[in-house]
C-alpha cells in the first residue's frame, strides 16, 4: 500500500508579491542548525545579537529592541496593546488597509480613535496632518510608513514633529520599509516602530522586530491600567530577553534565521542596501511605463520595495496572476478593498531585489499580459536595462 504521507516536497516558487519574499540560502542554512531550548545560554546569545541588529536596521540608539514571536500583525498588536489606553484619544492617519487595522486594534483596547483619512494611495498634506493633530490633542498618533496595500511611502518626520508638539507619542508601521528603505527611527522621531521578517529582511515569517524609545518606555510605566495582553506585554517580554526569566517558548530556529538575515543587512550596509532597492525599483518602473502601464502612486511617494502598477483596461488581473504561477512559478499579488482588480502588487525586496529579477519579472509579466490580449506599447526589458546602466 502506498504511503499517503511521503516526505514533504514544497513546489518551487519565485516570491515577487508583497511578502513573503525570497529567502537567501544562507538564511535557510541557519535554520538547519541544532534546535536549542528557549532558556539555553546559546539562545540568549543569539537573541542578544538579534536585538542589537534590530537597532541597527531601524537606525536607532534605543536600548529596547525585541523580536516579538508572531508575524508583523503581532508587532502591530504589541505596539497598540501597550500604548493605546482605554478612554484616551488615539489619532490615526489612514490612507490604506493596514492603517485601518491599527485603528481596529486600538478600538478593541478601548481607545477613542479619531481618524484623518485619505484616498488609498494618496499622500497626506503635512499641514493638514499637523492641524488635525493639533486640533485633536491625542494621547497617541499612528500611521503606516510603508503601506502594503497601495505601495505608498508616507513621510514620517512631519507627522512625528506635529505629534510631539501636541504631547503625543508616535507608532509607525514599518512592515514593508525595514531593510529596503530608510526607516530612520531616531532621525524621524518615531517612538514605537515595528516590522516583520518576511519582506525587506528576506527571512521567513514568524517574528516581528520592534523598537521603543526611552520616552515611550516612561509613558508605558505610567499606564493607569495594566496592558490587556499578557503575551504581548512588553515589560514581561523584556524580563524574558534581558532577565532570562521564562515567558514563552520562542522559536530558536526563527531566531537563527533572523540573526542571519540581519547580519546580511549589516554586512551590506544600510545605505548600499537602500540604494540597491531604489535602483532596481526605478528600473522596474521604467520597464512598466515603457510597456504602457501606469503606476498607482505618484513618483516621489512610491515604495522601493513594493511596486503597484495599474491593471490595463480589459485585462483580468486574476488570470494574469494565475498564468504567472502556473507557467513561471512566480507569485505576485493583486489589490484588495477599493483596489481589487485594479492593481498588481509586485515586490522586489530583500534578497529578491536584483537587476536579474527586474528583467525576469518584466518578461514574465509581459508574456502574461499578451496572453490576455494586451499589446505592450514598448519594450519593458530594454527600458529597464537602460535605467540600470544609467545608475551604475
Residue spans for each PLM region:
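Active-site C-terminal subdomain of aminotransferase-like
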Residues: 22-23, 198-286, 290, 392
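Conserved active-site segment immediately N-terminal to the catalytic lysine
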Residues: 185-198
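Active-site phosphate-binding strand-loop segment of PLP-dependent enzymes
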Residues: 123-179, 192, 200
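Conserved beta-loop-alpha segment that forms the PLP phosphate-binding cup at the N-terminus of a helix
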Residues: 63-91, 95, 99-103
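A glycine-/small-polar-enriched, mobile loop at the entrance of the PLP active site in fold-type I
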Residues: 12-69, 73
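Conserved PLP-binding catalytic core of the aspartate aminotransferase-like
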Residues: 294-327
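PLP-dependent enzyme catalytic core of the Aspartate aminotransferase-like
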Residues: 338, 342-392
Amino acid at each position: 500500500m502506498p504511503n499517503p504521507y511521503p516526505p514533504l516536497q514544497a513546489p518551487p516558487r519565485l516570491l515577487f508579491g508583497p511578502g513573503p519574499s525570497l529567502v537567501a540560502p544562507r538564511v535557510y542554512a541557519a535554520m538547519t542548525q541544532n534546535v536549542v531550548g528557549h532558556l539555553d545560554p546559546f539562545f540568549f546569545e543569539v537573541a542578544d545579537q538579534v536585538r542589537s541588529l534590530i537597532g541597527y536596521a531601524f537606525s536607532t540608539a534605543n536600548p529596547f529592541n525585541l523580536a516579538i514571536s508572531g508575524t508583523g500583525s503581532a508587532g502591530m498588536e504589541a505596539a497598540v496593546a501597550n500604548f493605546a489606553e482605554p478612554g484616551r484619544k488615539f489619532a490615526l492617519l489612514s490612507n490604506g488597509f493596514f492603517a485601518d487595522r491599527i485603528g481596529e486594534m486600538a478600538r478593541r483596547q478601548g481607545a477613542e480613535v479619531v481618524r484623518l483619512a485619505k484616498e488609498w494611495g494618496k499622500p497626506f498634506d503635512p499641514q493638514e496632518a499637523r492641524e488635525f493633530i493639533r486640533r485633536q490633542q491625542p494621547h497617541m498618533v499612528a500611521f503606516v510608513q510603508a503601506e502594503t496595500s497601495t505601495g505608498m511611502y508616507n513621510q514620517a518626520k512631519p507627522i512625528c514633529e506635529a505629534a510631539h508638539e501636541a504631547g503625543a507619542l508616535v507608532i509607525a508601521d514599518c512592515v514593508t520599509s525595514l531593510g529596503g528603505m530608510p526607516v530612520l527611527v531616531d532621525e524621524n522621531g518615531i517612538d514605537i516602530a515595528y516590522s516583520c521578517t518576511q519582506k525587506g529582511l528576506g527571512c521567513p515569517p514568524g517574528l516581528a522586530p520592534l523598537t521603543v524609545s526611552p520616552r515611550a518606555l516612561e509613558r508605558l510605566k505610567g499606564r493607569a491600567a495594566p496592558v490587556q495582553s499578557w503575551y504581548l506585554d512588553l515589560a514581561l517580554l523584556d524580563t524574558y530577553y534581558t532577565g532570562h526569566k521564562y515567558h514563552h517558548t520562542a522559536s530558536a530556529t526563527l531566531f537563527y534565521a533572523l540573526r542571519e538575515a540581519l547580519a546580511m543587512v549589516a554586512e551590506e550596509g544600510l545605505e548600499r542596501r537602500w540604494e540597491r532597492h531604489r535602483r532596481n525599483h526605478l528600473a522596474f518602473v521604467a520597464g512598466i511605463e515603457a510597456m504602457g502601464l501606469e503606476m498607482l502612486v505618484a513618483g516621489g511617494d512610491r515604495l522601493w520595495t513594493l511596486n503597484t502598477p495599474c491593471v490595463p483596461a480589459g485585462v483580468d488581473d486574476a488570470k494574469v496572476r494565475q498564468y504567472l504561477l502556473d507557467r513561471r512559478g512566480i507569485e505576485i499579488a493583486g489589490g484588495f478593498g477599493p483596489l481589487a482588480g485594479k492593481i498588481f502588487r509586485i515586490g522586489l525586496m530583500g534578497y529578491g531585489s536584483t537587476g536579474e529579477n527586474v528583467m525576469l519579472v518584466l518578461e514574465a509579466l509581459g508574456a502574461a499580459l499578451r496572453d490576455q490580449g494586451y499589446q505592450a506599447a514598448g519594450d519593458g526589458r530594454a527600458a529597464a536595462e537602460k535605467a540600470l546602466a544609467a545608475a551604475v
